[in-house]
Amino acid sequence: MDRLFFLDHSPIDFYFKQSPETFVVEEVPLYPFSGAGEHLIVKVRKKNMTTWQMLQSISEQVGVKIRDIGYAGLKDKNALTYQYISLHKKYEEALKKFSHPLIKTIELTYHKNKIRRGHLKGNRFFIRLKKVKPVDAKKIDEVLKILEEEGMPNFFGYQRFGIDGDNWQLGKEIVEGKRKERNKTLKKLLINAYQSHLFNLWLSKRIELSKLLNCFTQNELSQTLDLPRSIIKELQCQKPFFKLFPGDIAMHYPNGKIFGVEDVKGESERFFAKAIAPTGLLPGVKTKRCDGLARDIEKDYDDERISEFGDRRYAWIFPQELHGIYKEKNAWYELSFFLPKGSYATVLLEEIAHRKIKGE
């Protein structure tokens, strides 16, 4: 699917091919490790291999079962990545003998708990863009300023949808009963891709509505949107680009509980201050849906036949520590930034480029 971009600048020309030299990811833990406890915490560097391949190699050499290795999240294959894993400290001596050409243990400490999925604040990224002209470097500088000030949409990246980008279609067929999948792990993966696809469609729709509200008058919108003028006025008065709708579900930022948006004006001020952010639906069971006007939009991107657990996901995020430097001699533009967990650096790159970057 072609997602809708938040910014309206013309496409920026650069070359990006993901590799350990151009793409570095460093995991930021959710909490500091205590230095004491029965769990060995290991900072691991890997390149050109998946997290699963890394875990398999450690399991085989150290003698620990994969299910007994804790990790917070999966990291890119075609990259240089740093992440933390945990295993019982009885494996420490065996781990010290571990050797692999693509994996290196950087540091060791201890903690009382095992690392669990999702136990990370986010990730720091370093990205090198190539074949960047001076005029395009200046454009990138301007885009980074906007993204740091205003944030960006939290789309799922192309990696979520498989090599051919059609995993969501297979997941939809499973939900519809048109396809059987015996492998439970693969079945969940495909349905998750379908949930993510619906989220991306909804987010594009909300960006489209926000663009309309930012660009047209009340008179023009009253003829286009089936909304009372009072609602249009309330929406247009909001400072953020991305408009909150009555009945939206928001969440404290960068983490916290979800809550229903009742005071649209007040909550939009908190959103502008980066204290909260709206959320979108990942359809599934035991998941809260929006109310009112927000639900009128959301329902077109819901599928109540999905039997997997659903969730709410930030629709909008605020990149931090954004830095860019242009190396004219090499025609490189190097940027670094922090994103919260579950957010995609490639989505930020595509927002900068104003085009798809997969396959370059």
UniProtKB/Swiss-Prot annotation:
It comes from the Bacteria. GO terms for biological process: tRNA pseudouridine synthesis. Keywords: Isomerase, tRNA processing. The active site is at D76 (nucleophile). It is an enzyme of class 5 (isomerase). Residues 151-332 form the TRUD domain. GO terms for molecular function: RNA binding; tRNA pseudouridine(13) synthase activity. One of its GO terms (cellular component) is cytosol. Gene3D superfamilies: TruD, catalytic domain. It catalyses: uridine(13) in tRNA = pseudouridine(13) in tRNA. CDD domains: PseudoU_synth_EcTruD. Its EC number is 5.4.99.27. NCBIfam families: PRK00984.1-3 (NF002154), tRNA_TruD_broad (TIGR00094). Responsible for synthesis of pseudouridine from uracil-13 in transfer RNAs. HAMAP family: TruD (MF_01082). PANTHER family: TRNA PSEUDOURIDINE SYNTHASE D. Belongs to the pseudouridine synthase TruD family. This is tRNA pseudouridine synthase D. It comes from Nitratiruptor sp. (strain SB155-2).
